[in-house]
Design a protein with these regions (language model features):
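...captures the hydrophobic TM-helix bundle architecture rather than a specific catalytic motif
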Residues: 1-254
Length: 254
């Protein structure tokens, strides 16, 4: 395991773009879309840098971690907010930032007629940042924060043209149905904490052999429900068709 200080920039860049565009208001209308696209592309560049560094190390040393801060410290339960980049997550980092940047570029022209384009690009940046946290978090709690962030960003993007009742209804439907999957993930985290005393990926992996089959089965079922909700699998797939009500770039992103 290798330590790094640059992983946080993968998330911080698009997150800063979302914050600046939302807080900057109309002052960012003329150039906000360009800034959002540049920050998404910059995050992709950081991902390429991390990939190049990873390829230069042995297989055992390729995973990279970064501790951000102590998040929860209650009795014997301690959770550090941290990031973990390995061979699997780097593939998703490059997919999220690479395809996300292309969608940003396409949206510059597609949304050029919209007077509220700045807000749209802020939500795009927010989606990218949340998705990156989802794949980079080193614990189930970090994953959960990113998971909920993706749900919020999806709701905001699907219902972007909320002056049309059908679009507003579609975003609400997606948001509510995804809550079923969210409950599955939250119950899986509770099972992990109750039976293993940890919610970090490394800690859970270490405790698997000492955990009952019933607890592992329950946790697995809850994670399956979570995945079904988020990826629109049966029987939680009904929201996906309505999600196409959002602007075309949103459909591509989701």
């Amino acid at each position: 395991m290798t330590t790094s200080t640059s992983l946080v920039y993968l998330i911080a860049l698009p997150l800063a773009g979302a914050a600046l565009l939302l807080l900057g208001g109309r002052r960012t209308d003329k150039w906000g879309h360009l800034l959002a696209t540049a920050l998404s592309a910059s995050s992709f560049g950081v991902g390429l840098y991390e990939l190049s560094q990873m390829l230069g190390r042995s297989t055992e040393a390729r995973p990279v971690s970064q501790k951000l801060f102590e998040w929860i410290n209650v009795g014997t339960f301690n959770v550090d907010a941290g990031l973990l980049l390995d061979q699997l997550s780097i593939c998703f980092v490059l997919l999220i930032t690479g395809v996300g940047t292309l969608i940003h570029i396409y949206s510059i022209s597609y949304m050029s007629h919209d007077h509220d384009r700045r807000r749209f690009f802020a939500f795009l940046n927010l989606f990218i940042a949340a998705m990156l946290l989802l794949v980079l978090g080193d614990s189930y709690l970090s994953l959960y924060v990113g998971w909920e962030g993706v749900g919020l960003a999806s709701y905001l993007l699907i219902g972007f043209w909320n002056h049309k009742p059908a679009y507003a209804t579609a975003s609400k439907k997606a948001f509510v149905m995804n809550r079923v999957g969210d409950m599955g993930l939250s119950f899986a985290i509770m099972i992990a904490f109750a039976t293993m005393g940890t919610v970090s990926f490394a800690g859970v992996a270490e405790q698997v052999e000492n955990t009952s089959e019933a607890a592992l089965t329950g946790m697995g079922i809850m994670l399956l429900i979570a995945a079904a909700g988020k990826s629109a699998q049966f029987p939680l797939q009904a929201w996906l068709g309505d999600a196409m009500a959002g602007p075309t770039p949103v459909s591509a992103l989701i």
